[in-house]
Amino acid sequence: MSATVLNGVSDADLESALLDAPVSSLYDIAYTYGQLYVLATEEQVDADIDSEHIRAMTPDEQSQLYDQDNSLLSVRVNLSNGTPTLDDDVIDIERLSWEKAIKVGYAYPYRKRGAMIAHSIAHYANSKGEETTAKYARHRLTRWPTDEAVQQVAESDDQGIVNALAQLGSDDAVIETVTKAVERAVSDLGGTFDGLVSLKIKPPKGNQFLYPGQIPILNEAMVGKKRDRFESYSEAEDSVGAGTDFVTGDEEVPVLGITPGSPGDYIHAKQVEKFPGLDPNRGWQSRPMTVDTAMAVAAGGTVIDACSTYFGGGVEVTYLPYLAGTMDSDDARWLYRLLDDVLEGETITDVLQDRFYERSRRSNRLRAFVFATATDLDRKDKLIHESSEMEVYVPGDLAEAHVRALDAWPFSADDPRQVFSISDSDDAQLSRENSALFQSVLSGQYLKRTLFEPQRNPTKDANAKVFGPAEPRRRSDDRVFGPDNLPLEATIRLVSTDPLPRKRMVRSYARRIIQDQNVLLGAADKNRDFPRYTVLRQYAQWQALHATDAFGTEDFSPVPTIDLNDPPSMSEDTITNETKLEAFINNHDLLAADPERRMAFVLGGLVGRLTAYQDRKEIESTMVRRYSVDSITKRNVARITGEVMSANHDYSAAESLS
């Protein structure tokens, strides 16, 4: 944990950055994240940069460049002698870092879609060749300083820095020099450049070169460009009106409804192309925010992106932690240190697990806003499910209940009634490891590995990542889960304490057994004909879900649970396979109370026992292959029972003769 982050920020500054009321929406969370992120950034960067300017920057947007040498190319401009000129050393190439990205003042539209460009002087060249990189370098002098929004800010530029840059950009000789210098530098790098293209400027009467983000007027211009983009986004020419800020509650202030870069990337502007007949210039009447609030919300996007875990099928589940109740400065430090751990590379599931076992006063107040998004083929993120409150105890309590189920007599090698052996399994859901179970609940794997998966691709199963850190965002190569996907829906319900649909779960369990068996029956390994571990996972999970009251009150009697603490009523001396089977049935009301269900259960057990015998005798056409789960119906069960009983008689007779 970054134990000292925000220690250098005063209580007064922290509390002025916080909302005066408890968090009540995703916007509130994003605003809080953005405000704290800006304060932490300002604290950590060794440069005198105003927090208002940092709030508009996006240093993490191209964070992959931090691991690369030669990832920042700057054209050196000297404005110190009254006449703007290029420096004798025209080009400077160095390694970009997070702090340097702040000093450069890099500002990019959050989760950019389409052909949008950066608001800052710095522009990203994505592995571009000599000519394209040189073009980007020229534009730092020809296009950026002459932008309309930048020129409006230039009117208050006492030092004339913006116009001096524009003057250089209008000089053909200067542009030719820049072009040749950049092309030569990129050629020396192997012909391509992957990094930011920017400027280094020695300001009027200055004695050293500075990055653009270290020069206030250039930051003002960058903010002006971003403000202009907010106000005229999409079809709107001017979306500003007078209203009450949706987040802060400030009344009668200039507000806008256009918020490109909103949290989760699914709360977006009113767009006339999506809602015919709407006036985009009146977008401020929907979730109105001031520009400052909108920028804080957008700044929170960096933190929000870090709080996602990959569910599968192009779906991400995002957990956004917050504290219940109104926060004070110490609460803010505690919360941001949690978030900073995620920003520093820990997974959100790891961090939430650590806080669960912390068992502190604040961890008891810890909640999370949860939502799931899917990336469709048009490369836009779609909201599938959301919930405003997850309490951290939910996955922790469920993990502990699951371990108790695995310690109970059906799995216990110390109990003569044991029916399930899991000693040979390294499956996380059968390993009694609380930490793995906790994370599997949050990642969705806990239910994804037991419930039927629609559109499942069996060819990917062997390489599927079951537990661990979230995988990278996936795009068009993955199938997309829709709102009818029960594993995803049930995961969001489970962590949000919304009741699980019990009947749908039971049907889905059965379909998953069939699904997994069909995969096994089609595999080259003929010794694996039945998804044993799927059934064991389902059994332990069912007990754990009931133990934590995860189901609703829908009528489904009798409740199919057992007394996990029931003491053994028989000893090793008296136990037989018959008495063990009888004990199992008698301890499960759902079997004991229903003759048809009991008969089907015993039939399945007999098919399994005969298959084990056939495997020992190396008989390839086994009973479980002949009578797979999905082949048995109410119409043919009587015939199949007779055939299985006949086979049992024949094998018993043959065994007696041998």
Task: Mark where each language-model region is.
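Short beta-strand-alpha-helix junction that forms the catalytic/metal-binding core
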Residues: 276-296
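Short Cys/His-rich Zn2+-coordinating modules
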Residues: 213-235, 268-276
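Class I S-adenosyl-L-methionine
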Residues: 203
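Extended alpha-helical scaffolding segments
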Residues: 1-192, 206-211, 217-219, 252-257, ...
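Structural beta-strand/beta-sheet cores of well-ordered domains, especially the beta-sheet scaffolds
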Residues: 195-197, 241-243, 286, 316-318, ...
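Short cysteine-rich clusters marking metal-coordination/redox-active sites
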Residues: 245-249, 290
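Short, flexible, mixed-charge glycine/proline-rich loop motifs
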Residues: 229-242, 279-283
